[in-house]
């Protein structure tokens, strides 16, 4: 092995190590900034029908709060068609079984204010529940190579239906208390009631614009990559809803098998995922 090849392979190793090193840092940052941290694991399989047409299958499991809770499980299938060397189109369907964690919702109106003691807000608690989502997507991807760097821009239009679900809502209320001399003291918190709550069906149409850069290192099985993705909701236009950033690398085991590792940060909450960080692990196979 010559010096140049050794440098390239060492560089690839350090890039992978850097992604691993992000994990504990991300978790600490997530806890301090009220962001979430999770692990995303993906299994992908593809079958080439001919030079232009390919079928794709995907299964994914995501956790939240580290590995404490499952956030969602999904299964997807799709197809892509390559028009030219640099342009392809794809379409697919994803079934998502999503877990909404328990949520505390403070009531900011009419708080109980006690001088010298504090301000106390009533609140409601939505209990955890599962719901089904059906997602359809259409994509157009263009690719362009600059030396050993491949740039790609994917524009994806996705439509998501989130089915209705029933959960329980608990209402907690503060009650004013007095001592024997009728002085206000620490109030007591009581559960007023727990009743079923209907989460109505939701519809979401979003445009996702993702720019990706891959570095093809000569004579090396590791391919570093980075991407930035912009989400724009079309049925409730407010400009850019969120940004998602990824950095990672893939490793080609052999002709048909590869694994990948990445770090992801998302800068805003939405109906799909919470704001926060994730470490992703993936396995891909060509059938």
Residue ranges of model-derived segments:
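Bacterial Sec-dependent N-terminal signal peptides
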Residues: 1-33, 287
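Outer-membrane beta-barrel domain signature
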Residues: 29-34, 63-68, 125-131, 196-202, ...
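Start-of-domain marker
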Residues: 31-99
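Predominantly the C-terminal beta-signal and adjacent terminal strand-loop region
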Residues: 226, 240-287
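Residues on the lipid-exposed face of transmembrane beta-strands in outer-membrane beta-barrel proteins
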Residues: 41-47, 77-81, 138-142, 157, ...
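Repeated loop/turn-to-beta-strand initiation elements of outer-membrane beta-barrel proteins
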Residues: 52-57, 86-91, 147-151, 219-223, ...
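Residues that define the transmembrane beta-barrel architecture of outer-membrane proteins
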Residues: 37-39, 71-73, 132-136, 201-207, ...
